[in-house]
Each structure stands twice: as C-alpha cells, then as structure tokens.
C-alpha cells in the first residue's frame, strides 16, 4: 500500500484478499486517481521460491503453531526498498504492538515519505525478520484478529486522510473528536 504526497506506503500480505481493492475505493480511491496518494498491495507469496508458494513454517528455534517465513518477507521488503532507493520505515501490525492513536497517524504522515505495513498471519511472523527489518510494531487494541490486513487498512486510512487534498476540506479532520485530543 502506498500513500502520502510524493511518498509511498506498502501493505504486504500473504493472502489474495481485497486489500488493494478496498483501498482503491471512495475517498482514498479518488485521491489516488488525482495522484495525491499512491496505495499498493504486495503479495508475499510472489516472493517465495517454493512451487507451492508456501509462506508459513514452524518458528525458527521452536515454538507452537506456524509463522510467516522470514525469507519471502525479506525479499518483498528488499524489493520495495530497492524500488524506493532507500530503506523504508517498516511497521508490523501485531497484537503485541503499541496501541495506535490519532497522534500516531499524524506522526507517520509528518515523519515519513514512505511506509511499509507488514500484515502477519498464523502465530505471527519470523522474529528474525522483525529484528532485521521492522522499525515499530503497532496494534489496534487488546484483541486478536486472524491477520494484519484489517489493522493495516485502518492505519493506512488514518494516515492517508491527513494528506492535504485527500479530504475536500481540511476542517473535516481538524474538527474531528480525536484531532486535538478531545476524546
């Protein structure tokens, strides 16, 4: 998912869900048509080398369940960074992350030209990828979802709508309940 004026946000997921489709509709879709923001979804399975396009495996070092493999995640991350010509600020959407607030949306919009949002699945993602590539972990709250796509879309929407020109009138968001900490 790519977002922001002259900048990029990428959502990376392992399932053929409608992340790209959902982000191409309504206000964000119109903003993309006007080249105000750019949103792009990357399919992690395209970066695996096995014939089955498998992206899950047992955790490195043991543990319960399956995690997303480090290599396909890393290959996708590397591809996006090479395309951008720089290391891109990377956020892993995780129930263990810091809770996301409106202030975070403003900080991300103001601080970064490009963002990568990594969607976990299964029991999460390989910790080696987190240690090597992830700059921060964000959660939507104290609950667990089946994957990171919904949180990634929420974060992307919250950040992108702050980009000048996305909303028709800046007062639309300046008068919202969370803009100045009213709630």
What are these regions (language model features)?
Residues 12, 40-42, 89-91, 115-116, ...:
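Hydrophobic/aromatic beta-strand patches that form the interior of the parallel beta-sheet core
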Residues 125, 129-176:
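Structured adenosyl-cofactor binding patch, chiefly the S-adenosyl-L-methionine
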Residues 34-48:
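A short beta-strand-loop structural module common to alpha/beta enzyme folds
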Residues 69-121:
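S-adenosyl-L-methionine/SAH cofactor-binding core of RNA-modifying enzymes
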Residues 1-6, 10-11:
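Single conserved hydrophobic/aromatic residue that forms the stacking wall/gate
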Residues 179-183:
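Long, charged alpha-helical interface segments
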Residues 49-51, 56, 60-75:
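A short aromatic-anchored loop/beta-hairpin motif
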Residues 18-23:
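Short N-terminal binding/cap micro-motifs at the start of the first secondary-structure element
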